[in-house]
């Protein structure tokens, strides 16, 4: 009888009382046997065998397994568990590598934190449109079903991107970039249905932070692992492998190619003209090398965001049930306390609205309160009322989140509805003030922007009121998209030209007695077509001189604007053409 045991061969002879074990030390005073790697002293006629029970006609064999041998045998019989890879790249994910790198280059070159309206133009539009198309195509090829939000958001982004090329919204520049930056981050998680509640909700802030920080960090290495990881034929085809090698070659060789082109352009005028005039290349080796270098971390981030959004499971990092339970445990404000505060505040609102109504009736009748002017009345308290409206939104949110849940909900709804209605009344007072201000002193962008914001607040409080009657009404979602739609429409309205046209026409018709035409100098280049048209058609020499002076002031202030083809902007280009026609300095 023979048996293999942990690299030892044990031979057992059943006719004798002696068992010999290979590689074991035996100490025996009678007829004893020591088993596999152990010293056993025994005074009887027993045989100890490692891991085996042997019965014999004359002797009893006791089996005494040792811990070390059991562990070794058990380990040797186990099949190693293969660790599941963190990333499972498909052919489509590999193809996205050069696409994302191109997007990163365009972002760094034509749309970055240092880019203002002086350089925002065709390049920024190209980057944003390609970004939207790339994300949508990537999702479509991954068999993702688009929801209505992803379509609406994509359309809004493209429209806002077009405004970068068509209009010169200098006064909206900062707001446009803030809105676009938010949507650029928010788009992938919307398209790939990775929002916490599968749609824009009250958790929009967490959804944005998740897209901005958590998903890119969790997938920070995906760009490089996808680029350099070894793949078998089962994971990538030969064509994909060649495609990746070509991309790597271009990525590594681009700086050297640019240096060669620069040197050849310097050596031959004809060669230089080919790139200068045919392709409009602006060869700046240090700048473009720096752009390529900065494009790598940007590509790493964008790929982590887009690819991570396609695979990330939000349930691992955010549990909605746990969140709701935490919020239930966090409530501590008795509703009676909220009712008391809201009742007192509403009383003050009613008193304030009554006083303003009396003032407004007097103003419509042609009389002003003592020691008041139109401008003082219109300006006084305008932004304070906007702040009050925002405070009311915060109050309503706190009331709904932190109030005790097991109390009667009926009275809370009544208080929220009352607060919202009075806030709408306060906004109406603000509208009345703004109307008086504009009709007396004309339009400015700083009067249009708050007016549009007030319209947005009207939508918000109207949605809040509806939400109190219909529990499933998506207040946050509709407010978010109402705000975005209003803002995009504002950007497409070319408000700087609208302001100049309204003021100039009203001034020439005698409807703005307090307006100073020299205020046109504060306009931007979007106002140049309006000024040029009035200058060209007017026969009043004094008016023409004033308009010429205003146009010189505008173009003198914006004379530093660049004129690159990739930074083309229709309004800016039109303004420079008008500058030539008006012979401006």
What are these regions (language model features)?
Residues 520-585:
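Extracytosolic and intramembrane catalytic regions of membrane-associated proteins
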């Amino acid at each position: 009888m023979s048996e293999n045991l942990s690299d030892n061969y044990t031979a057992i002879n059943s006719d004798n009382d002696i068992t010999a074990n290979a590689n074991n030390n035996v100490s025996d005073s009678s007829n004893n046997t020591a088993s596999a790697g152990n010293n056993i002293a025994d005074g009887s006629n027993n045989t100890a065998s490692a891991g085996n029970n042997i019965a014999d006609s004359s002797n009893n064999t006791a089996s005494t397994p040792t811990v070390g041998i059991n562990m070794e045998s058990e380990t040797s019989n186990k099949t190693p568990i293969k660790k599941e890879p963190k990333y499972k790249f498909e052919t489509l994910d590999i193809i996205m590598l050069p696409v994302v790198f191109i997007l990163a280059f365009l972002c760094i070159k034509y749309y970055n934190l240092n880019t203002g309206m002086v350089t925002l133009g065709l390049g920024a539009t190209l980057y944003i449109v390609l970004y939207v198309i790339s994300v949508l195509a990537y999702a479509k090829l991954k068999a993702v079903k688009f929801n209505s939000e992803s379509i609406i958001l994509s359309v809004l982004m493209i429209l806002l991107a077009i405004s970068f090329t068509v209009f010169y919204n200098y006064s909206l520049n900062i707001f446009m970039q803030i809105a676009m930056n938010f949507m650029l981050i928010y788009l992938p998680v919307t398209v790939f249905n990775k929002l916490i509640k599968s749609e824009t909700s009250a958790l929009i802030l967490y959804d944005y932070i998740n897209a901005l920080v958590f998903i890119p960090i969790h997938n920070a290495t995906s760009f490089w692992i996808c680029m350099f990881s070894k793949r078998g034929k089962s994971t990538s085809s030969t064509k994909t492998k060649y495609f990746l090698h070509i991309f790597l070659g271009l990525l590594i060789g681009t700086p050297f190619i640019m240096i060669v082109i620069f040197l050849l352009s310097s050596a031959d005028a004809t060669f230089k003209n080919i790139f200068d005039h045919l392709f409009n290349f602006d060869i700046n080796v240090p700048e473009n090398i720096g752009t390529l270098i900065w494009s790598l971390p940007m590509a790493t981030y964008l790929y982590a965001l887009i690819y991570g959004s396609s695979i990330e499971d939000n349930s691992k990092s955010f549990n909605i049930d746990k969140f709701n339970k935490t919020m239930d445990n966090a409530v501590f404000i008795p509703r009676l306390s909220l009712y008391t505060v809201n009742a007192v505040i509403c009383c003050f609102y009613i008193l304030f609205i009554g006083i303003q109504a009396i003032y407004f009736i007097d103003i419509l009748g042609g009389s002003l309160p003592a020691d008041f002017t139109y401008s003082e009345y219109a300006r006084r308290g305008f932004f304070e009322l906007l702040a009050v409206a925002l405070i009311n939104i915060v109050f309503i949110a706190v009331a709904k989140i932190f109030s005790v849940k097991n109390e009667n909900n009926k009275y809370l709804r009544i208080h929220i509805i009352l607060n919202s209605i009075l806030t709408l009344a306060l906004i109406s007072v603000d509208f009345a003030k703004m109307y008086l201000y504009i009709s007396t002193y004309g339009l400015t962008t700083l009067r249009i922007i708050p007016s549009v914001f007030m319209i947005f607040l009207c939508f918000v409080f109207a949605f809040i009121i509806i939400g109190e009657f219909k529990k499933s009404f998506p207040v946050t979602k509709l407010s978010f998209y109402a705000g975005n739609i209003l803002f995009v429409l504002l950007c497409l309205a070319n408000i700087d030209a609208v302001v100049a046209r309204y003021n100039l026409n009203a001034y020439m018709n005698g409807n703005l007695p307090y307006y100073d035409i020299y205020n046109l100098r504060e306009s931007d280049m979007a106002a140049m077509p309006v000024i040029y048209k009035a200058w060209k058609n007017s026969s009043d020499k004094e008016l023409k001189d004033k308009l010429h002076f205003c146009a010189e002031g505008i173009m003198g202030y914006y004379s530093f604007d660049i004129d690159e083809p990739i930074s083309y902007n229709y309004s800016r280009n039109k303004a420079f053409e008008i500058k030539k026609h008006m012979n401006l300095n």
